[in-house]
Amino acid sequence: MLAKGSEPWLFTATFITALFAVLSRAMNSSHLNHVAYIAMAMTFFMVLFFRDPERKVEVSDTYMISPADGTVIDIRGRKICIFMFLQNVHVNRAPISGKIREITYKKGGYLPAFCKDSERNERNEFIIHSKYGDVSVMQIAGTIARRIVSYSRVNDNIEQGQRIGMIRLGSRVDVTIPHDFEIIVRKGERVLAGKTIIATIKK
């Protein structure tokens, strides 16, 4: 399955590949043939990047799940920071069930998403009102990622694990954890959106 909104990108890449392939044959040009192979490789990369595999999500109000694929690069108090590498799936999912109370988009720079200065980067924040209080899911663009996509709207009722948006080409997602939960992931741990449990309800 391909991510929602990927069609224009893939159509353009496929069209360019086909165009250079036809031109290289028509003009018998080895140079254009090489360009066609490069375009084909880029198209393959785009398909790999925009993949969005189906995942069976076990919905529960006793734990929170990761909103993104990637690696936990920092835990700051009640906030977990997850860095998504280029090879990761870049579709983001709701860590908890609730209602989207607010969505705030801010323009900004494009510093590496793992840097502290990336707090000034382009970002999109979801405030999900859950039974345990508000949960913030912050999408942060990186040096390559320059387009944040939102699949959800204010007042949408969302289920844990539901797709809420994506960031193109490498980025970071921060999620806040309510005080009713205990954070169980550690810095350096790899996580999967909709699958990895990142916090459990306190007993």
UniProtKB/Swiss-Prot annotation:
GO terms for molecular function: phosphatidylserine decarboxylase activity. It is found in: Cell membrane. This is Putative archaetidylserine decarboxylase proenzyme. Binds 1 pyruvoyl group covalently per subunit. Pfam families: PS_Dcarbxylase. GO terms for cellular component: plasma membrane. It comes from Methanosarcina barkeri (strain Fusaro / DSM 804). It catalyses: archaetidylserine + H(+) = archaetidylethanolamine + CO2. It is a peripheral membrane protein.
